[in-house]
Amino acid sequence: GRHKIVFAGGVEKMTDVSGDDATSALAAAAEREFEADQGATFPLLYALMAKSHMAAYGTTRQMLTAVAVKNHRNAARNPHAQFQAEITPEIVETSIMVADPLRLFDCSPITDGCAGLIVVSEDVAKASGRPYARVAGRALSSDQMFLHRRTVFHEMPGVTRAAASALKQAGKSVNDMKAFEVHDCFTIAEIMILEAIGLFEPGKAGPATLSGLTAIEGKHPVNSSGGLKGKGQPVGATGAAQIGELLLQLTGRAPKNRLIPGNPTFGMAINVGGIGTMTGATVLEGVNK
């Protein structure tokens, strides 16, 4: 309550260094001694999580591809996205292998970008007479940093806890959320997160994506911005960018070609650090739209 109007945002300039140096810097969010410094950087860690998910639920290469194709399709409708073109399944599945089963187009890119939000007290928001989004729930959760110490590689309990807490604060269920922005640093991450928050049963997010349920026009629109995969992943700006996209969707101000149908009121953002080591979950409610 000390301030009524504040600015919150982030920025990241990643392309001034080599890809190897950027990968090394990003690995600071992983366990260094026994994992990252031994070669287990994030592509490999998420590849192990993907292999585990595939073994447990029969998740297929085509399901991972569907995430990438969907998010690039959404990014092509976003003038602020890093990638401005749609891609085909063939492009994804013939791109170079990074860490089996993850190919180049399963991985979010190295990105320059920034995002900013104006956060105000509710009386200021109401007095403005403009559409705004209310923070209905907000939670943080942490989890094991060492992948090799987890008993189940493909589960993200920190994501589950953060989402449940934010939804409880908002007095809503995950099915009340009609727009989602989630941390698809790799295609398998989107699938695991959607299951961790309870939107889909374990093993069902991949088939749901393949069938179109998570498309902008689907029942559960996910990453209308293009996500990290298509919009880009300027790390320090990613969380604010997710909130910014939900603000546009929940107040009806997103461009018409990517506006979620049905005039959604509630949405959820899930931002993840590392392999789910840290999770921020936010529930927003559109007001005055």
For each feature predicted by the language model, list its residue ranges.
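Short, high-confidence coil segments that cap the C-terminus of an alpha-helix
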Residues: 2-4, 177, 243, 264
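Flexible glycine-/small-residue-enriched beta->alpha junction loops
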Residues: 5-57
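A glycine- and small-aliphatic-rich helix-loop capping segment at beta-alpha/alpha-beta transitions
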Residues: 20-31, 123-124, 196-203, 286-289
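Condensing-enzyme catalytic core mediating Claisen C-C bond formation in acyl metabolism
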Residues: 32, 65-66, 97-165, 213-225, ...
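N-terminal leader/propeptide and maturation segments of large enzyme subunits in energy/redox metabolism
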Residues: 40-89
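Short, well-ordered amphipathic alpha-helical segments that serve as non-catalytic structural scaffolds
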Residues: 46-50, 121, 156-170, 245-252
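Short glycine/threonine-rich loop-to-helix capping motif typified by GTGT followed
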Residues: 147-152, 184-207, 218, 234-237, ...
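Extended C-terminal subregions enriched in glycine
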Residues: 153-160, 164-187, 191, 196, ...
